[in-house]
Amino acid sequence: MRSISRTTFARAYLAITFFSVSAGIAAEPVALRVESFTVLPSTGPLAFVEVENRQPDPYRGMIALKPPEGWRIVPAEREVVLAEKETKRISFAIELGRNAALNSYAVEVTATAGDTKVVRQQNVACASAPYFKPTIDGNPDEWKDAIGVRFTEGGKRTELRTYWNRRSFSLLVAVEEDTLIGQRRSGAFDGVQLAISPADSRTATSPDKVADRYEFLLAWTGQGTAGKCFRLAAPETQLATTQNNRDLSSLQYDDATVAVTRTDGVTYYECSIPFKPMRDRIRPSEGREFFLSVLVHDPDGTGIRDWGKTAGLWPWQRNRLAWSKWPGAKWGKQPPYDNKLHWGLCASKY
């Protein structure tokens, strides 16, 4: 489906926006974030709001979620009680929802405590993988029935599409960029870095702890459609180890299948990763939730594009230990965001 870059992919993405009656997010008593939906809104899923107490005192307030026009969510509001620095997930049931062609849903969440009100506006996506086994050959035609998740960084668009079956998890990343730099022995090169984690995992903040993720790097070899996959981390990998620039040849993961193509200024990374090594922690089944995040490396263009930023993670959720270093990466001044973004496995997008 070469039209991904011409039609749906080429449409403008509505950026996440913020609004608050307070002076700024650092001064607000609570921080708010609406998580991505993990199944399509038309199927009546739960919508989750993360609320973090940012003050040194307990917080008690009411949380209200305003959905897109024409939707119905219950209850209208929920009470939340938070201890100092505590974070909770508040759920709302979508009784009536409609799927959007662009997979972008404008929502507004409000926290009210007495005369103090905090409001955040977001555009959230449905982040879910339908059941299907694509052929990994560099041709994106089979991905039209996947759910596209789109974001823009530095004026360049990125689109993520995912599938799953009992044996593998598949990913297509369409990257709008000026040039594609293949893997080389020295100097920076392009790539896609992804982290997959169980839904109950948390990223540690100390290098003496161990990883709780399966982390991979996809890169073009520089020849034809050939791509490579490197496994940068697995559960129990020492986080201190992930912060070293290790020789990629020792990390090559031949159990994954990768193809890389480029058409009309868009690079397509297509990959299939076996579930077998992950099955004990992430069992493939309809309705399963897990964490998935992606970094796009475009060293001669936009730099790093971080799905965590677009998904609305808070500024203090940047975590250098959430992502492995590797030779050829060109990191920015700030560390990337955490890799714990909700994703789901569903039956179909229809």
Each model region followed by its residue ranges:
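Short acidic, flexible loop segments centered on an aromatic residue
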Residues: 54-70
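Intrinsically disordered, low-complexity Pro/Gly/Ser/Thr-rich segments with frequent PxxP/GP/PP motifs
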Residues: 71-98
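Beta-strand-connecting loops/turns
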Residues: 42, 85, 102-103
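N-terminal leader/targeting signatures
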Residues: 5, 14-15, 147, 165
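Beta-sheet-dominated interaction scaffolds and their linkers
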Residues: 27-48, 79
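Structural preference for beta-rich elements and adjacent junctions enriched in aromatics
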Residues: 34-38, 50-55, 92-350
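N-terminal secretory signal peptides that target proteins for export/translocation
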Residues: 1-9, 94
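Bacterial N-terminal signal peptides
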Residues: 11-22
